[in-house]
Amino acid sequence: MFWLLIAILIVQRAAEMAVARQNEQKVKKQGAIEFGESHYPYIITMHILFFLSLIAEVLLMNKQPSSWWLGIAAVILSVQIVRYWALCSLGAYWNTKILVVPGVELVKKGPYKWMKHPNYAVVILEILLIPLLYQAYVTMCLFSIFNAVLLSVRIRAEDKALQEYSVK
């Protein structure tokens, strides 16, 4: 079951990166400006290291699924629904990079009606829940901290770009 989960998550991330590349091309044709380029490689690296850490901790420490695995898995699936709701709500404006088309109105539909950054909430929950599924507490704690640091930089950069270039 562990390797199936890892395979699903890796395929999901690869598909999201492909969508992000397509969306980047679309919005750049509309005049999108990229922000936060300097921290972007750190975000990619953190996500790769998250998976490597999770695999290492589960295998080397012979971690087994939590006795609460069914409930945790149900929450993870619910979080995925929010992920794709956010992605679909942004349409071509969804990206892993900070790309802002000057003068375009901020999206206020889907989960963006209630939250400014629902996809970041999804990532926070995934970094907590996926390791929790296998009792990989070291990975959960370390990467929650790394993610918090990176998101504090990223969200500030994104908010500044949106504030400056988007129509409210």
From Swiss-Prot:
Matches recorded under InterPro entries: ICMT_MeTrfase, Metal_cation-efflux_comp
Cellular compartments annotated: Cell membrane
One GO CC annotation: plasma membrane
Membrane topology annotation: Multi-pass membrane protein
TM ranges: 1-21, 41-61, 68-88, 123-143
Molecular functions per Gene Ontology: protein C-terminal S-isoprenylcysteine carboxyl O-methyltransferase activity
Domain of life the protein comes from: Bacteria
Pfam families reported in the protein's UniProt record: ICMT (PF04140)
Keywords per UniProt: Cell membrane, Membrane, Transmembrane, Transmembrane helix
Name the UniProt record assigns to this protein: Uncharacterized protein YpbQ
